[in-house]
Amino acid sequence: MSAERLVYVMGPSGAGKDSLLAYARKHVREPRIAFAHRYITRKSDGHENHVELTRDEFAARAQLGFFALEWSSHGFRYGVGVEIDAWLAAGSVVVVSGSRAHLPAALERYPQMCVVHIDAAPHVLAERLATRGRETADEIRARLARSVRWAVPDGIALTAIDNSGTLDDAGRVLVALLEGLARS
């Protein structure tokens, strides 16, 4: 398995991670790049690549070992299926949408993975979160406070993408990174 071909994309809420991943899915030309969907115990809003599961369904799949990666965040459960291991073994570059808090556990399973941090200026994050309409003003402030406290673990090579500007600008950076990994 080529764990260095696993691309773990993470970032604070409102950074535009899902928009960038959708942009990359649309614009990559390399067929060996695969985008993993997540399994999440919340309703799909149509803006991210995920399969909605009930808490019981999620727990059953976790117990059966169906997840390569799993974590809890904001009262929900998130998982990435073990199918990514087969995709990696077949030589694909596999892109997953992860969590900053879960990064240490993900690195235990995939120590050579490529870590990508998507971020945006604080005022951009606040504006996007308010527009999204999922949280109250207090919840948005709490999310922004968490993003300030996050730090890169020691020894981790990190690719940072600033998504404060246009989606095309940040999207081209992500697409170039993925296509470069696929060619290597």
From Swiss-Prot:
Pathway info: Metabolic intermediate biosynthesis; 5-phospho-alpha-D-ribose 1-diphosphate biosynthesis; 5-phospho-alpha-D-ribose 1-diphosphate from D-ribose 5-phosphate (route II): step 3/3
Key word ATP-binding present: yes
Gene Ontology molecular-function annotations: ATP binding; ribose 1,5-bisphosphate phosphokinase activity
Catalytic activity: alpha-D-ribose 1,5-bisphosphate + ATP = 5-phospho-alpha-D-ribose 1-diphosphate + ADP
Class in the EC hierarchy, top level: transferase
Source superkingdom: Bacteria
Positions of ATP binding: G11, P12, S13, G14, A15, G16, K17, D18
SMART domains hit by this protein: GuKc (SM00072)
One GO process term, biological-process aspect: 5-phosphoribose 1-diphosphate biosynthetic process
UniProt cross-references to Pfam families, sorted A to Z: AAA_18
Keyword Iron attached: no
Alphabetical UniProt keywords: ATP-binding, Nucleotide-binding, Transferase
EC id: 2.7.4.23
NCBIfam families for this protein: phosphon_PhnN (TIGR02322), PRK10078.1 (NF007485)
Function: Catalyzes the phosphorylation of ribose 1,5-bisphosphate to 5-phospho-D-ribosyl alpha-1-diphosphate (PRPP).
Family per record: Belongs to the ribose 1,5-bisphosphokinase family.
Name of the featured protein: Ribose 1,5-bisphosphate phosphokinase PhnN
Organism from which the protein derives: Burkholderia mallei (strain SAVP1)
Gene label: phnN
